């Protein structure tokens, strides 16, 4: 004779049905599984920083060298690096604005028929923020130029920005480079990935990582590749990738400045027989801008179109510059580094 069936036996036979809401068979009774809090997130990044201490110190040293170089160099070097970095970031972000089109937009507000004006405006904003002005520490909404259209809107931007800023303040003990990496990867989670997308996150991180630098107002992240900005993995792997990519970008920036300084010295010597203000102003424009058109040079130097074209032809004939865009109204020249 079989034993009587109890209510417990009935429930045991229903093993294939899901448990009650919130039930987790891997969690011991009495313990609820929770999302990691701010303290847990910060602890992960602190452990990641400790694991990358040697590489972090090495990269910080390279940043210090770039900062010193830019402090001693002409103002135009910072502007040039900001243009190059912004153009590289645009390709990573999907806007795909080339350096020549960006130069025309920043200098003359000119865009092609097929170009996205909103994308150009985003990348132009990146140039301005990378090149100077108050950093994100002065207030994220002001830095981004984003404000709530309706102050009483649900989930206002100012509230989301404040949450992100609070987490950054909580990570004040982290090195600025680590803290910038954390901020970049928490950007979307804070609900900040709106109209500016990854461009705003990367520019904010680039300025934050520079800390109190006087020469290097931003840390290059995308020059020579955007490995530093790739998502995926735990904080330890993200920070490792961040440092590797940042070191490569810093080396690219330093090599570029080496080549630019050598070109400037060579151009001064070759152009010494020329008289007037235009040759020197044109040489300076080619230092400040990676690509220059005749209308740009006319505006930057204040010289006549004829004087600009004559000097450009003279410099091209002596191998100082070369044309990079072919025929057309906006032919572009760059220094032969």
Question: Which stretches of residues belong to each language-model region?
Answer:
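FIC/Doc superfamily catalytic core
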Residues: 1-337
């Amino acid at each position: 004779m079989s034993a009587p069936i109890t209510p417990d036996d009935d429930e045991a036979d229903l093993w294939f049905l899901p448990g009650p809401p919130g039930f987790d068979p891997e969690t011991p009774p009495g313990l609820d599984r929770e999302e990691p809090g701010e303290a847990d997130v910060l602890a992960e990044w602190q452990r990641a920083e400790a694991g990358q201490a040697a590489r972090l110190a090495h990269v910080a040293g390279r940043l210090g060298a770039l900062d010193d170089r830019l402090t001693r160099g002409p103002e135009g070097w910072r502007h040039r690096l900001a243009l190059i970095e912004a153009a590289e970031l645009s390709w990573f972000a999907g806007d795909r604005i080339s350096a020549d089109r960006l130069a025309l937009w920043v200098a003359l507000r000119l865009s092609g028929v097929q170009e996205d004006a909103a994308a150009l405006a985003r990348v132009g904003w990146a140039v301005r923020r990378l090149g100077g002005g108050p950093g994100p520490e002065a207030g994220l909404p002001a830095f981004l130029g984003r404000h709530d259209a309706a102050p009483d809107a649900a989930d206002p931007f100012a509230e989301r920005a404040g949450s992100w800023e609070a987490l950054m303040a909580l990570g004040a003990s982290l090195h600025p480079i680590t803290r910038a990496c954390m901020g970049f990867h928490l950007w979307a989670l804070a609900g900040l990935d709106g109209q500016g997308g990854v461009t705003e996150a990367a520019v904010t991180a680039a300025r934050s990582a520079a800390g109190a630098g006087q020469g290097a107002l931003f840390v290059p992240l995308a020059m020579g590749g955007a490995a530093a900005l790739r998502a995926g993995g735990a904080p330890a792997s993200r920070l490792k990738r961040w440092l590797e990519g940042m070191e490569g970008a810093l080396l690219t920036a330093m090599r570029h400045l080496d080549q630019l300084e050598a070109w400037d010295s060579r151009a001064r010597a070759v152009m010494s027989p020329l008289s007037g203000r235009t040759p020197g102003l044109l040489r300076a424009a080619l230092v400040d801008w990676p690509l220059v058109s005749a209308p740009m040079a006319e505006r930057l130097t204040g010289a006549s179109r004829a004087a600009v074209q004559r000097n450009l032809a003279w410099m091209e004939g002596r191998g100082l510059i070369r044309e990079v865009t072919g025929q057309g109204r906006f032919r572009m020249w760059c220094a032969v580094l």
